[in-house]
Amino acid sequence: MKLEPLFNLDPNTKVRTRFAPSPTGYLHVGGARTALYSWLYAKHNQGEFVLRIEDTDLERSTPEATAAILEGMEWLNLAWEHGPYFQTKRFERYNQVIDQMIEQGLAYRCYCTKERLEDLRHSQEQNKQKPRYDRYCLHQSEYPVDAPHVVRFKNPTEGTVVFDDAVRGRIEISNRELDDLIIRRTDGSPTYNFCVVVDDWDMGITHVVRGEDHINNTPRQINILKALGAPIPTYAHVSMINGDDGQKLSKRHGAVSVMQYRDEGYLPEALINYLVRLGWGHGDQEIFSREEMIALFDIHSVSKSASAFNTEKLQWLNQHYMRSLPVEQVATHLEWHMKKHGIDYSNGPNLAEIIPVLSERCKTLKELAISSRYFYQDVENYDEKAVAKNFKPEAIKPLAKLAEKLTALSDWTVENIHEVMSQTAQELDIGMGKVGMPFRLAVTGLGQSPSMDITAKLVGKDRTISRINNAIAFIHTQNV
């Protein structure tokens, strides 16, 4: 049968993988891991990665879901060489192949009504037989071609489908277990399993990496490929991802959408690093650069056991990348969160300056953005517990002394601010805590923050002194 490639298939490309999501919802972490494994295997073998949108479910597929999938792939920086291809734009190709299969006796029209099929199923169940089509229409000729019908693939009735799964090893399925699959519906639309076969053939896919829920589809697809005289890809069915309670990962475990992790403040580098370790590893190594993943990844080394999603581990990785990536790169991602939380970061220190300071305490960019407000916005409220502890009348004297000494500073440096704090404590004969804690609450409104010499340096001289004076006025009003 004639092969119609969508692009010039380079005969020197030994590996061509694909990611083929259905646009019926967001890109979830399971799909993202499948995409990552496919992408890594292609890159490891100097191959190509194809993106295909399997949108044959016309009722459930939406443009919004397609956009969300593409956004997720781009955010994860999983670039594709070919695509995205949409199955709904290839119906003519699928039907062309189906018509040729009918002509060659590889498929046949089935005119059976729903009632007949239901009666057949009921009869087989009564006789404790596995429900399957009885090929009643295979040799029928009295029906007009244009009468309502489906098209079925003529599946072999003898023999066994055998394939060596790259993850699970050898799998064998008897053809007696397989039915004559419907490959075209009554409305003329081709079915999912058939579209996948033609796409993998046309696109020269050599390795199919997908979830274990597709294992049952594989022998059916292999039989169609064999009937077409097409090469059979290597299949790799990866395990599901469970929550930390052992149950299938779902919304009740927290975020499951890739972009939801973005919204929660995770870096794409952290999520990629975490996902690659959910089923694959290299010794005891936990941190992998993208270059290391490409160099080391092998689909044959992926575990066939289910993996458990651990949010604490992801947070640990995220904090690592917040600290270790180039600060300008982290700042680019942080900008999105600052805008989302309504923080005008042009009115204060550069984001690159606050990231090293706050990332010691924050595990996500969302936390970091929220924690940074006092660098860019006036303090309107004070933490109540901190007020009760640190804004007593005796705090006025060290605050006033601080304001006086800080005002006199000509060089606003961390070292000079720290020296002012030490001098204030010495001159008033009090501990540094009696100076630092009221100072912190005055400048940040909080009971906790990075060290105050660094914090005040970033807040700026005028704002720092103004906030100290506001705090003194506040303490006076609380103790009238």
Curated annotation (Swiss-Prot):
Pfam families: Anticodon_2, tRNA-synt_1c. Zn(2+) binds at C110, C112, C137, H139. The keyword Transcription regulation does not apply. Its cofactor is Zn(2+). It is found in: Cytoplasm. GO terms for cellular component: cytosol. Binds 1 zinc ion per subunit. ATP binds at K251. InterPro entries: aa-tRNA-synth_I_cd-bd, aa-tRNA-synth_I_codon-bd_sub2, aa-tRNA-synth_I_CS, aa_tRNA-synth_I_cd-bd_sf, Glu-tRNA-ligase_bac/mito, Glu/Gln-tRNA-synth, Glu/Gln-tRNA-synth_Ib_cat-dom, GluQ/Sye. Its EC number is 6.1.1.17. A motif ('KMSKS' region) lies at residues 248-252. It comes from the Bacteria. GO terms for molecular function: ATP binding; glutamate-tRNA ligase activity; tRNA binding; zinc ion binding. A motif ('HIGH' region) lies at residues 21-31. Catalyzes the attachment of glutamate to tRNA(Glu) in a two-step reaction: glutamate is first activated by ATP to form Glu-AMP and then transferred to the acceptor end of tRNA(Glu). Belongs to the class-I aminoacyl-tRNA synthetase family. Glutamate--tRNA ligase type 1 subfamily. Monomer. This is Glutamate--tRNA ligase. It comes from Histophilus somni (strain 129Pt) (Haemophilus somnus). The lineage of its organism: Bacteria, Pseudomonadati, Pseudomonadota, Gammaproteobacteria, Pasteurellales.
